[in-house]
Amino acid sequence: MKNRINELRKENKLSQMDLADIVGTTRQTITSIEVGKYTASLPLAYKIARHFGLKIEDIFDFTDIDEEV
């Protein structure tokens, strides 16, 4: 799933480890989400969105969801 995490993280001068610590996950999970290898769970997506002060749909691109189902 496409997302803006890398862009938002860099705008906020956060490393992958910084964001992982903030949202309670691992750096590897953040890396996998950023490159599209892993889709964040709803609770994790919510924590990421809340940290950046955005809605989930402002970070994650759901247009491909219908094709994946």
Predicted regions and their residues:
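DNA major-groove recognition helix of helix-turn-helix/homeodomain DNA-binding modules
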Residues: 43-58
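Short, basic-rich loop-to-helix N-cap that marks the start of a DNA-contacting helix
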Residues: 37-47, 66
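Key DNA-contact positions within bacterial/archaeal DNA-binding proteins
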Residues: 17, 28, 57
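Short, charged recognition helix plus adjacent turn
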Residues: 60-69
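Recognition helix of helix-turn-helix/homeodomain-like DNA-binding domains
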Residues: 25-38
